[in-house]
């Protein structure tokens, strides 16, 4: 065993002891107060600003004022979601079905968290874990270590007021390493990964139950029925928030040609600047230098972004983001992928159907399962996208990054981790929320038997194949004659 592995093992020992004490007696009030203590640690205005300032200083990503808003809004929304939720003991009782559901803690949860949201994402995981009676150990990105450490200090200060053990919320100490993260993944009861797709893959291969979320590459359609002015305003607000650190920030816009000129004018009024071919090539060359995103351009203010690219544009003083003309999609056109910067790629299509085809092409290149957006007055088109595109979310007439992770004016749970289903190689297709932080035990009692006849279940099939079947000789099964569960052998049931 290496020293780094031993360090993680020591965290696990302390976490398991603290979690056992915390969960003893299954006290809902204790869980609720602990969750609120963690929430107040990040939401208290002075601490929030300190964390936000530290986040930008340490990671070089985003904007302080927007991180303050994000930390507050995301945490307040989560508290709203879980405010009256029962997360321990009996959470559902259905006498008609003879079922009683009991919420149980998972135990010790590990969470690998990104540098893009070094306070908000850990806080969300911590609150959900505590709400459900768990301990949690964080593995922050190297750039986010100091922010995470400050957050935990604030949480522990709140814990002291309630007499809670600090070991309920811990972190892998600096310096971060792949060895430490791997040991954590292999040792906890559940591992949650937000951010690096390499870490997501490693989590799924660790042998531990894992929840990983997929890559973003949010792509949005503006069709010919859209309120173009409103669409441009929402897209600009979402694209520029926190300098596009969100995985839900728009990366590509697909516009139906009929409203292109009107949309570009509206986008210009919101600070979007369509680049000519020369400037666009200069931005792409700089942004994707060496085959990967340029860290000197991602999540930077627009003046820094343009300076690194060596580009000057008209009305630069009022510019908020740039628009790159798009044509191709795929590895040879990196602008069709996630950019994590104040650059938006614009595709133009003749009609809605070809726009849908373009979105599908983009998602199959990157971002499958995450989300698509639609600005339209035709709600049937939203349903069409949901039925036909490889996506877990269709965001309709909303600022994408404010909607995908939950909003006070939509029904999604507040989260910073969006599951992308099988399309994105994930085990969940929903926003990460409190239900993912608990086990459920089901008590199953006998109820009056409800066994259909063969006529009840096969009549429509027999009609469809044009055959008349005599089922009069069918066998009625007594409870003791039922076929065993398919994972148990006949030999094993013989001895029940």
Spell out what each predicted region is.
Residues 2, 8, 123-124, 200-330, ...:
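ALDH superfamily catalytic-core signature
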Residues 11-13, 212-214, 243-247, 333-340, ...:
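Short, flexible turn/loop "capping" segments at secondary-structure junctions
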Residues 87-230:
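Rossmann-like NAD(P) dinucleotide-binding subdomain of oxidoreductase/dehydrogenase enzymes
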Residues 24-27, 312-496:
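Conserved C-terminal structural/oligomerization subdomain of aldehyde/semialdehyde dehydrogenase
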Residues 24-30, 49-52, 165-168, 241-247, ...:
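Flexible, glycine/charged-enriched surface loops at secondary-structure junctions
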Residues 12, 16-19, 23, 35-46, ...:
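Structural signal for hydrophobic packing residues in well-ordered secondary-structure cores
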Residues 1-100, 128, 269, 474-496:
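N-terminal Rossmann-like NAD(P)+-binding subdomain of aldehyde/semialdehyde dehydrogenases
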